[in-house]
Amino acid sequence: MAASLPLVFTAPKRGMPPRHLADLDSAERKEAVKELGLPAFRADQLARQYYARLEADPEKMTDLPASVREKVGESLFPTLLTPIKHLACDSGDTRKTLWKAHDGTLLESVLMRYPDRATLCISSQAGCGMACPFCATGQGGLDRNLSTAEIVDQVREAAAAMRDGDVAGGPGRLSNVVFMGMGEPLANYKRVVAAVRRITSPAPDGLGLSQRSVTVSTVGLAPAIRKLADEGLSVTLAVSLHTPDDELRDTLVPVNNRWSVSEVLQAARYYADKTGRRVSIEYAMIKNVNDQPWRADMLGKKLKKALGGLVHVNLIPLNPTPGSEWDASPKDVEREFVRRVIAQGVSCTVRDTRGQEIAAACGQLAAEN
């Protein structure tokens, strides 16, 4: 195994983009408009353009006087993300976008269309500091946090692409957002929570998605899980557990050296109790590493004890990453694992894997141009 990378919780303080409308809450928007010498009603007008009409170019905002569009653009609508390329697979139902930020930082998002929904997987950091050895993003290290607006703009762009029929299947609606792209969302806590509020608030304060259709994933930053539980949000929490025992998890998910399996599950229980939401447990099935029958039994028992009925296990067939020595578990091993977890009274299914051939699946995002 390659030498392990250090854990990085604090991102370098560099490269953050200029202020954007999506960084601001309602009061801050009004103040920003006032600074520009515009009447207060323009604040809601601009927000409706961005959040309801999904328009980020003031030159196309026809209800805005032509004389102020340039000033508004410079002050509140800097170009945050420029698409470098789109890659599609799964008959066009999966589209990965490589974005370039204002400072040249690269990041990725993945739009997945299903018969009954459209889900966007978004990044919260450029790179990741959690150093999980089976994940391409974690092996690349952390460049920087994304701003609230950089996170929100990934969602606005996908919502516009769905509305305009820019993806296979014709026009539709973006229904779900998962913070499962690049980065550890809870290590960029303040901006991620602000982004969740923008994504879920109704216009003119946000994009109007249901909180229940938003999932925030974490490798298990226990104090931040508890903090999120107290935010008054009802988003789904997904915990990347990957093994039920501390000995292996210390290697697979290095943050386990800081917060053990039991501490993470206690925090998850607190989240479930506070929100009434079932917690998702993510488990990448790695051949001969974490797929043994006894680990399935232990996982089921620990989850049943910690979370009762407020838990669901998503088994994820390991997605290949460059240079990795690990493989996905065989299907018969996968099936037996599911059977054993369910036998302990815990809900468990295998996730439908999308985007593997364009390196858009879980653990594959590396933002390579």
Curated annotation (Swiss-Prot):
It holds the Pfam family Radical_SAM. Its cofactor is [4Fe-4S] cluster. The gene is rlmN. The keyword Iron applies. The active site is at E108 (proton acceptor), C362 (s-methylcysteine intermediate). Reaction proceeds by a ping-pong mechanism involving intermediate methylation of a conserved cysteine residue. Specifically methylates position 2 of adenine 2503 in 23S rRNA and position 2 of adenine 37 in tRNAs. GO terms for biological process: rRNA base methylation; tRNA methylation. The keyword Magnesium does not apply. Its EC number is 2.1.1.192. Binds 1 [4Fe-4S] cluster. The cluster is coordinated with 3 cysteines and an exchangeable S-adenosyl-L-methionine. This is Probable dual-specificity RNA methyltransferase RlmN. It is found in: Cytoplasm. PROSITE patterns: RADICAL_SAM. [4Fe-4S] cluster binds at C128, C132, C135. S-adenosyl-L-methionine binds at G183, E184, S217, S240, L241, H242, N319.
